[in-house]
UniProtKB/Swiss-Prot annotation:
Residues covered by the TrmE-type G domain: 217-365
Protein name according to UniProt: tRNA modification GTPase MnmE
GO biological process, one term: tRNA wobble uridine modification
Alphabetized InterPro entries for the sequence: G_TrmE, GTP-bd, GTP-bd_TrmE_N, GTPase_MnmE, MnmE_dom2, MnmE_helical, P-loop_NTPase, Small_GTP-bd
Annotated organism of origin: Rhizobium meliloti (strain 1021)
Residue sites binding K(+) per the record: 227, 246, 248, 251
PANTHER family xrefs: TRNA MODIFICATION GTPASE GTPBP3, TRNA MODIFICATION GTPASE GTPBP3, MITOCHONDRIAL
Length: 439
């Protein structure tokens, strides 16, 4: 059910700031603008206005933009007040809006929710918008742009149209098999396309792991025996002191982490307790947590200050790549052979750091030359795609034409749930809660 309330909120960042943007949306927008500014500005033209209280007291002056329905972000009458970003200025304008009848403060994500309800955005675009606001790396920005700009939705819509066409032809064959204007056997052509569509969906699902790395970061765990230089490496890569570094073995008792940006990708770097047998209770808990983090790693940096001490096989998950890093190589002993490690490093002198960064980048996904990042970025997308693929598989192996048509309908519904065109009411509160108040 669509709301008839008119809502307002600060849509820009935290105060104070050079400029603050206050957004209003709903049927009372035009009246609220007239009360604040005296006259309604021309649609979609930034106009300088003095903003006053009901008693004529000047609150501020700024640019005002008015977007009549339906050509606005929310699809409703909407306006933006671009004013000076002082706390007192913004507070006074918000108080004046609150005192205006028919207006209320917006809830988190309510502007975006109205855009969805009014058909201005689908759910994939809404989620992409949330990701774009939260993006911290270049690859996160590119992935979010692909979704918020409608590229991903266009792909799903194309698949849905193919399913609709297939269903229509099959229904025609079922209902009008005796009619001359209905092809006698469309099944062969239709099911070939359904098979191709299933392959396309499965290929799309296979890229979900890459999207997860882009959104959530590549998990790199620094592991090794106590006093191997793990905390020093964490500090060196982070370029600031995060972990305590001493010559005492077992200093790190808990898992420490830091977020980095590497070649446009988000990287989550974990420093762990040294792996050894110990009776000390707190250190044992730290080692247990270290093993847990290693089990979830995308890449392990295995450190040792001595040749032949790269021992982690008992806790390393299958198929997780390992880079063996020889540490403290600025010391005169021990002596390392070239085959003893992959990287030879000294965090004190910086020797080997460039080689390590190059090695880390080689484990990042290769997206060179790819202009679009069409891939499912959320678990719910993958779940719906798997449901669609499973329904298509059932349709391909079934012998009953009516059952096959029903499986195509289920596949189409699964695709529709991704964009929000089918049965998603229970998801909306979760999705829109990711937004700030003014979005």
């Amino acid at each position: 059910m669509l709301s008839t309330d008119t809502i307002y909120a600060l849509s820009s960042g935290s105060l104070p700031a050079g400029v603050a943007i206050i957004r209003v949306s709903g049927p009372e927008t035009a009246d609220a603008l007239v009360r604040l500014c005296g006259t309604l500005p021309p649609p979609r033209i930034a106009t300088l206005r003095t903003i006053r209280t009901r008693n004529g007291e000047t609150l501020d002056s700024g640019l005002v933009l008015y977007f009549p329905t339906p050509a606005s972000f929310t699809g409703e009458d909407c306006c933006e007040l671009q004013v000076h970003g002082g706390r007192a200025v913004v507070s006074a304008i918000l108080d004046e809006l609150a005192a205006t009848g028919g207006l209320r403060h917006a809830e988190a994500g309510e502007f975006a929710r109205r855009a969805f309800q009014n058909g201005k955005l689908d759910l994939v675009e809404v989620e992409g918008l949330a990701d774009l606001i939260a993006a911290e790396t270049e690859m996160q920005r590119r992935l979010a742009i692909e979704q918020s700009g409608g590229g991903q939705s266009a792909l799903y819509a194309g698949w849905a149209r193919r399913l609709t066409h297939s269903r229509a032809m099959i229904e025609a064959e079922l209902d009008f098999a005796d009619e001359d204007d209905v092809p006698g056997s469309v099944s062969a052509v239709i099911w070939e396309d359904v098979g191709r569509l299933r392959q396309e969906i499965d290929g799309h699902i296979a890229r979900a792991g890459l999207a997860e790395i882009i959104r959530d970061g590549l998990k790199i765990v620094i592991a090794g025996e106590p006093n191997a230089g793990k905390s020093s490496l964490l500090n060196a890569l982070a370029r600031r002191d995060i972990a305590i570094v001493t010559e005492v073995a077992g200093t790190t008792r808990d898992v420490l982490s830091v977020d980095l940006s590497l070649a446009g990708f988000s990287v989550k770097l974990f420093d762990t307790a040294g792996l050894r047998e110990t009776d000390e209770l707190v250190e044992r808990e730290g080692i247990r947590r270290a093993r847990q983090v290693i089990a979830d790693a995308d890449l392990v940096l295995l450190l040792s200050e001595k040749p032949g001490h790269f021992r982690i096989d008992e806790v390393l998950p299958e198929n997780v790549p390992v880079i063996r890093v020889a540490t403290k190589v600025d010391r005169p002993s021990p002596s390392w052979a070239p085959s003893d490690a992959d990287i030879f490093l000294s965090t004190r002198t910086g020797e080997g750091m460039a080689d390590l960064l190059t090695a880390l980048q080689s484990h990042l996904p290769d997206l060179a030359g790819r202009t679009a990042l069409a891939m499912p970025s959320r678990k719910r997308h993958v779940d719906c795609l798997r449901q669609a693929s499973a329904a298509l598989e059932r349709s391909l192996i079934s012998s009953d034409l009516e059952l096959r048509a029903e499986q195509l309908r289920q596949a189409g519904d699964a695709l529709g749930r991704i964009t929000g065109r089918v049965d998603v009411e229970n998801l909306l509160d979760v999705i829109f809660s990711e937004f700030c108040i003014g979005k």
